[in-house]
Amino acid sequence: MSDEQRNGPPPAPPPEPGDASVPEGLVSAVLNLVNTGPVLLGAYTIAELTAVDAIVDFLEARPSDEVLAEAVRSLAARQLLVAGSSEEQVQVRGDLGITVAFQRRARKVLDARTTGTEPGEPWRILLLPQPEGICLMIRIDALGVHQIGLHKLDEALRTLIDWLPGGRVAKPDPAMDADAVLTASERSALVTVTDYTAQGSAEVAGASRDLILARNDGRLHVLSRDPRDRAELVPTGAEDREDVEERLAGLLT
């Protein structure tokens, strides 16, 4: 057994002045719950998440100060945001506090965006893997509502794969016009995994890698960026659905 397994997960970093803090022991307690099944953490707007620093900075445009102020008032009225131990801090409570804690622990994010979705479907899914083999999953709908939950990583990946475009994998064709395939596709998706670092409460994007899926006439085209020219898309050589799933999982390693 490793030291981490004996001693529990590493504590969340201490909050910066003006940050929202989360109760001690919260992370380890929730980890035990996730091992028994998904832990659903509620739905929030981007302004509410930004107000408590619960969103990766480079993924979203920052709402206006007026919108953020209204979000703070809304959270305070619901007792999700209360005074902290000093005048410079506030404490995030309830499920939103859990979201903050696990967002801060992540150091990479999978961002999947899909076209051709149906009413009631999310158009975007974020996965923020954790060291213990679980992840924070955020489903974003057309209204910008963020449905958040904690899941085992393998289960979250299965959910993601079921949501992404499917079909019989097309044979790689070097002469294929990628732009034409994407334009004519019934459903397409861009999956980007970005590593990042934290500087205080701010996240700074690092290296990233992409996988592009496009379903056209029942065939699934699997593309990636050409390493010689990242503006160009080329077939990946994926042979079947299992190969696609392995490539998606490989983006996170």
For the regions a language model picked out, list residue spans one by one.
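Intrinsic-disorder-associated interaction segments
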Residues: 16-23, 146-153, 237, 241
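Internal, well-folded beta-alpha domain core
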Residues: 146-201, 206
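Short, amphipathic alpha-helical interface elements at domain boundaries
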Residues: 2-76, 82-86
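Extended, charged low-complexity segments
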Residues: 199-253
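Accessory beta->alpha helical hairpin/"wing" motif in late/C-terminal subdomains of nucleic-acid enzymes
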Residues: 82-134, 139-154
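Short polybasic amphipathic segments
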Residues: 135-137, 191-195, 220-223
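Amphipathic protein-protein interaction modules
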Residues: 71, 102-117, 205-222
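Charged, compositionally biased non-catalytic regions
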Residues: 64-92, 155-180
